[in-house]
């Protein structure tokens, strides 16, 4: 008797099916969604057609601030205090705006440009501060960037910082307050996800963004920027980014 042939969808096949399902889902959702999915083990990367769109970053840029502060400390440009570390933790845990304001003023330089000047070093080559929205410029709260930039930044964090700094950030992102347990969090607890979310009602409508990782050793990274463009609200965007993350990441092998 000849053995029965059977096809099993694993690896690249599984990823392709997930991406097809994800793109079909996004076609039913309000607004424009850019995403970049990366498998750090195989090197496979998928970026959809909106990954290069310029979108308000909202609070995802706080992760970039944390990366920059650790990088500057490693370069001997500053020495972070216990208070600084506590504020960085608040930015990641509850997305604390006051903590971000303090650190932006404390380490942004007299003209507030140091963070923006540094962001390209971490792959955020298209980030642009936006004028006309407050007394301070540039200001962390009014910036636009791309999903590609967020992908580069989270991967810099995982590979280029000192191991103890990366471990500190990973732990913080895996233990966020319930206010941020959406987006990449949708990968599910067995995937040990971590994320930094950003949500805000901006000029042009709500944005709901998420950037993070999932899987053993943070194997997979996912960056998502959802510009609702007036077609939906915060709840819609959070639902979209969470379901997208579930489709792409849940139970990945």
Residue ranges of predicted features:
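Secretory targeting and sorting signals
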Residues: 1-8
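Structured C-terminal helix/loop/strand segments within mature extracytoplasmic catalytic/sensor domains
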Residues: 9-23, 27-29, 53, 161-174, ...
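Short, conserved catalytic-motif segment at the N-terminal edge
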Residues: 31-33, 37-54
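Active-site-proximal beta-strand/loop segments in catalytic clefts of secreted hydrolases
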Residues: 38-40, 91-96, 103-107, 123-124, ...
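Active-site SXXK
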Residues: 43, 54-78, 91, 222
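Conserved catalytic neighborhood of penicillin-recognizing serine enzymes
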Residues: 73-125
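Mid-domain, small-residue-enriched loop/turn segments at the edges of structured enzyme/sensor domains
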Residues: 106-161
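A conserved catalytic-loop motif detector
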Residues: 140-201
